Every structure is written in C-alpha cells, then in structure tokens.
C-alpha cells in the first residue's frame, strides 16, 4: 500500500529548486524544476518526511525540522532549513540524475489527506513514504519497511510466546516465590537452629524429606542467615544502647578487685559510690563499666579534681594546687579516653591543651566522666590536702617525686 505520493525534490535532486503555491520556496542558483502539467498546485514534490497537504504551513515547517535524512546527502546545497539534526536516520543513496515522474493526480490527494495526521511516524522511517522513486532507493526503503513490520510482528509474537511459556516456567525462574508449608518451615527452622550452614548430603536428605529441591533449600538457608544476621545486629544495638546507661547495669563487685590487681596501686582505699554522680552521661564507648565512682576527697575543696594520666610515663607533680597539666585534650569533644582503667570523657569546654604546662586552672565544670571502677589511692588527688598529687596511669609504676623532667609521650588517643 502506498503511504504517500510526494518525495523530496530538494533532498535527492538538490539542483532543482521549486516554489509551491503555499509560499515555501527553495531558492537555489540553478534552473527551476519544471512541474508536471497534470499536477498543478498539489503535486509538487514534497520532502519524504513531510506528509502534509499544501495548505498546512506550520506542519510543513515541522517536517522540515524533523527530516534530516532528506537533507543529509547534500552538503553543498545553498539553503537548508535549520534544526535538521536527526542522528538516527541512515544516509540516502546518491541522487538520481533525473526526477521520477510523480504518481497520477487522482490517487494523490486522498492519500495525502490520509497520511496527513501521521507526521510522527515519518521520523522513524523517513524513506518509507515514497514508493515512486528510483530503483537505487526503493529496495532499501522496501527492506526497511519490511524490517519494521518483521520487528513489530516478532516482538509481539515473542511476547505472546513468553506469556505462554511463563506460567509453567515460573517454578524454576529466579523471580518465583516458593510457598513453603508450615511443616516444611518447622523442619527448616529446626535444622537452622542446629546448623546455619548445610552440607550437601544433609541438604539432599532434607530435599528428599520435604519434597523440595536442593536449590530451594540452599536459597532458604541463605535468606535465613541474612535475616538472622540482621536480627543479631538489631539486638546488639539495643543491648549496647541499653546496657551503657549508668542507671541500668551496675558494675559487679569483682570489677573493682580486678582493676585493683591490674593497677597495683599503693595506698588504695575502698570505694563507695558517690551520692551525687558527677556528669553521668551515658556514652556509647564506655565498654560496659558505666557506674561512676570517686575517691574520698578528704575534705578538699571541690574545684580541685583529680585527673588521670594516659601514657606509660607517670611523673608526680610538686605542690601546685591547680596547675594546668591536664591530660585531657580540650579540643576533642565527646570522645572518651581510656586512662588508667578509667574511661574519662574529655573536656568539652576550653582549657589547656595536652601536656601544655600553662599553669592555667581547670574550671570546676570540666566534664570529666569518672565512669571507671578502678580504685585509686587517697594520694591521687591534688590540692592543699596532699603535698604531692599523683597522676595515675595504665602501667602504674611511680617514679621518684619531683617536678616533671619531660612531657610524657602520648601513645594512644
């Protein structure tokens, strides 16, 4: 069936400009293409991609914008309509030496009118619309036309075949969801309780027992392991967040003795829980030693707090009641430091930097979280009550008293 009766004279026969009655003129420097006498105004050769009647001027512009394949083979044409960028259209064969005679005028207006409301199809197969062109072009267009028909028919038939085959094939497809019975689920859960990973003989045995395939059992165990891992992760987060709050889990009494033996401090005194717990903030890195203990301060003034050391060197300081040799970095906020068995949360307000002997007094509101359970001696607080304030650390060896000779090296923070 012929879809259209016009072909692009400016595309294939670019040397012959024409002027239509609707006001569209292709201006070229060569002689004008002589129109056929039988076709007066409606039978000028239109572009192959434009299927419009002569009266549709706006759609004719759109067809000129769409059909790049009509203009692609003429790089030396003087005037091309702008915006012809269709990269998907194949190039035309070389132009014929003379124009083909147009079809009879009786069939062309009706076919033109029938093909008028379909300009979108012209972008897919621009050369399908001209059945009356030279033999160099016609087989290619016929082939492409048949190819599109074959593609459409094959895709529809493929869909129908896939639709026919998919219901029986869903049992073996990956996307199929296997419905397990309650008895099968009980057996699978029981097996998972004892063995999270099945060996192949046991898997074959269970497949025969439960009337399932090995693949189904393997995939069920994979999914069940992932679910188990997710559940364990959720439980671990819940217990860790709940167990680290100081009000929930008290420290067992053996923890004090263990830390005492680990520290081997000289003048250790028994601890008692303080009545007002200082800065009892639940932190997630306190490693399950959440209850706070303080040493008896022996009637010392409250601003003079004890500070614990962090490194392997533990010098003892001279009597300087509020000497600012703090072992807490004031710039690292909220990260607890493991110091001498105690988990001390570093200060969040301004203070002297690490090991800076700046002689600045620590403010009494420094957020020191004494959440460790290790006992410390009564000589481990400085102030006017004790002439030599001692700074304890993890290794707990005490060098001779005197002023500090060098700044201790910070090994882990």
Swiss-Prot record:
SMART domains: HOX. The keyword Transcription regulation applies. Disulfide bonds: none annotated. Residues 72-131, 143-177, 230-252, 374-413 are annotated as: Disordered. It is found in: Nucleus. Residues 88-106 have a biased composition (Pro residues). Signal peptide: none annotated. Belongs to the Antp homeobox family. This is Homeobox protein Hox-A3. The gene is HOXA3.
């Amino acid at each position: 069936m012929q879809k259209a009766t016009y072909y692009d004279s400016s595309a294939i026969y670019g040397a012959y400009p024409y002027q239509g009655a609707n006001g569209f003129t292709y201006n070229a420097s060569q002689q004008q293409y002589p129109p056929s006498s039988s076709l007066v105004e409606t039978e000028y050769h239109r572009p192959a991609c434009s299927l419009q009647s002569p009266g549709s001027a706006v759609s004719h512009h759109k067809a000129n914008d769409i059909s790049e394949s009509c203009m692609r083979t003429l790089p030396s044409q003087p005037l091309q309509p702008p915006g012809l960028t269709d990269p998907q259209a194949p190039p035309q064969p070389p132009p014929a030496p003379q124009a083909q005679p147009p079809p009879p005028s009786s069939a062309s207006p009706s076919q033109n009118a029938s093909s008028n409301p379909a300009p979108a199809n012209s972008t897919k197969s621009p050369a399908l619309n001209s059945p009356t062109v030279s033999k160099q072009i016609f087989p290619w267009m016929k082939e492409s036309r048949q190819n599109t028909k074959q593609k459409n028919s094959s895709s529809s038939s493929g869909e129908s075949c896939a639709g026919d085959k998919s219901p029986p094939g869903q049992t073996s497809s990956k996307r199929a969801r296997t419905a397990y019975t309650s008895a099968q689920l009980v057996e699978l859960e029981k097996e998972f309780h004892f063995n999270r990973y099945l060996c192949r003989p046991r898997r074959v045995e269970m497949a025969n027992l439960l009337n399932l395939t090995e693949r189904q059992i393997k995939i069920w165990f994979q999914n069940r392991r992932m679910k188990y891992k997710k559940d364990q992760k959720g439980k671990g987060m819940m217990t860790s967040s709940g167990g680290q709050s100081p009000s929930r889990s008290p420290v067992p009494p053996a923890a004090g003795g263990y830390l005492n033996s680990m520290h081997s401090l000289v003048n250790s005194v028994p601890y008692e829980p303080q009545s007002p717990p200082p800065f009892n903030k639940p932190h997630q890195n306190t490693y399950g030693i959440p209850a706070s203990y303080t040493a008896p301060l022996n009637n010392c003034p409250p601003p003079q707090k004890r500070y614990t050391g962090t490194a392997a060197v533990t010098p003892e300081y001279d009597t300087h009641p509020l000497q600012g040799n703090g072992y807490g970095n004031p710039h690292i906020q909220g990260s607890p430091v493991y110091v001498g068995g105690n988990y001390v949360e570093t200060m969040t307000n301004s203070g002297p930097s690490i090991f800076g002997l700046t002689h600045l007094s620590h403010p009494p509101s420094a957020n020191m979280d004494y959440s460790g359970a290790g006992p410390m001696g009564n000589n481990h607080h400085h102030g006017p009550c004790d002439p030599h304030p001692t700074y304890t650390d993890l290794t707990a060896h005490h060098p001779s008293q005197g002023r500090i000779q060098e700044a201790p090296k910070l090994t882990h923070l």
